[in-house]
Design a protein with these regions (language model features):
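Membrane-proximal alpha-helical signals and transmembrane carboxylates
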Residues: 2-9, 14-397
Length: 397
């Protein structure tokens, strides 16, 4: 009898503890998927924070054929701190705020130039915050403005930004996705500075934030554009095009890209890079750091506008040497820019701390100046493994 009573008590307790006391219906939550942080001119409330919240009814309309309901709603507040902004947002978001599904953070360029090192404490400290969220810099605009652009192809602006950046990274390589924990690691590192991808608006107009942006064949849209260089938590300049891509070559962030080299006065050859791996070594010479970098590239010839026989192995070797020289010039130019800005976005200081810990311990406080004057040597090796499906070029009659 006692055993039966005990079993009943255990069953009752199991029923009680299996309940979800903190359960919430989706229509009771304000699911925040994007956060934008801008500088605010009011010194009492220096931050302007925009939250992009999922609109379930608009999402359903957008998913159906011909639906034009907005899938997201933006709410903007000003505050002294990021945490206070989240609390103030509860006064205007008509549902319980839920930030656990945050998918990206955008920082306005003005705020980035003022400094971002203090922002991440609140973002990283929150118990519901994921540290695998990508970070972007709004180029020439505010984060609030970019979140307001109505994208014709994607349901939400946030998703469009992420997919556009990933596409650019996989096909050209001048930008890359940088996550929150990687940014925090670089901000707290004594031997590496932060670099973050930029996003901008192409075909910007008054209609960019209107539903009429759906109704044109040349709409305003968001594009991945450039790499923002930081020094000690403050943005100092932009890198663009080949210069930005060269930085990704140094840090082995290139997945695929196309390199165009001349083959005549008017003709060019396009080499598609299918693999790129870099290594860096550091040493001390006469009490000064010497940085040695090497880059190994594998590529395929994908296009030529020159009348050349690509079956000739000597010709392929010639293109390999030309591509090596071009990449070497681009990388040296990029490193030179970074040295001028005293922004070690490559992590040369971290490499030096591992190979020469005693020297690093004595000079790490002065690394920005040492990096600026450091000797850099660059070695590039290119292997063109094939010339595509055709050896001879097409000739017009």
């Amino acid at each position: 009898m006692k055993i039966n009573i005990s079993l009943l008590w255990m069953a009752a307790i199991c029923l009680l503890i299996s309940g979800c006391s903190n359960y919430r219906e989706l229509n009771e939550l304000g699911v925040i998927i994007g956060m934008g942080i801008d500088h605010n001119d009011d010194p009492k409330n220096p931050y302007k924070v925009t939250y992009q919240v999922i609109n379930p009814s608009g999402l359903a309309q957008t998913s159906t054929s011909g639906g034009k309901g907005l899938a997201v709603i933006n709410y903007t507040v000003t505050a002294k701190t990021i945490v206070e902004a989240f609390a103030r947002a509860s006064a205007i978001i008509p549902r319980e705020n839920n930030i656990s599904h945050l998918s990206l953070i955008i920082i306005g360029e003005e705020l980035a130039r003022n400094g971002i090192d203090l922002l991440y404490d609140s973002v990283d400290r929150g118990k519901n915050q994921r540290v695998s969220v990508p970070i972007f810099i709004a180029r020439g605009k505010t984060a609030e403005y970019l979140f307001g652009v109505i994208e014709p192809l994607e349901i939400t602006p946030g998703k469009n930004i992420i997919t556009t950046t990933k596409s650019e990274q996989s096909d050209y390589g001048s930008t890359n996705e940088v996550l929150l924990y990687e940014t925090i690691s670089a901000l707290t590192s004594e031997g590496k500075d932060v670099s973050l991808p930029g996003i901008s608006i192409r075909n910007d107009s008054k209609e960019a934030k209107q539903l009429s942006n759906f109704e044109t064949t040349s709409p305003a849209y968001i594009e991945a554009k450039g790499l923002a260089l930081f020094r000690k938590g403050k943005m100092v300049r932009w890198l663009d095009g080949e210069t930005a891509r060269a930085a990704q070559f140094v840090t082995s962030e290139i997945n695929r890209t196309d390199v165009v080299i001349p083959c005549s006065e008017k003709g060019n050859v396009t080499i598609t890079v299918i693999r790129a791996k870099s290594k860096m070594k550091t040493k001390i010479h006469h009490e000064k750091p010497v940085i040695q970098t090497s880059l190994n590239v594998m590529g395929e010839m994908m296009e030529t506008s020159c009348d050349l026989d690509m079956s000739n192995p000597k010709l392929l070797k010639e293109f390999e040497r030309k591509m090596e020289n071009d990449l070497k010039k681009q990388i040296k130019r990029t490193i030179s820019i970074a040295q001028k800005e005293k922004s070690d976005i490559f992590g040369f200081g971290d490499a030096l701390s591992r190979t020469n810990p005693d020297y690093w311990r004595l000079h790490k406080k002065n690394w920005d100046n040492l990096f600026s004057d450091a000797e850099i040597s660059m070695k590039v090796n290119v292997d063109i493994i094939n010339s595509g499906m055709r050896m001879e070029p097409y000739k017009s009659k």
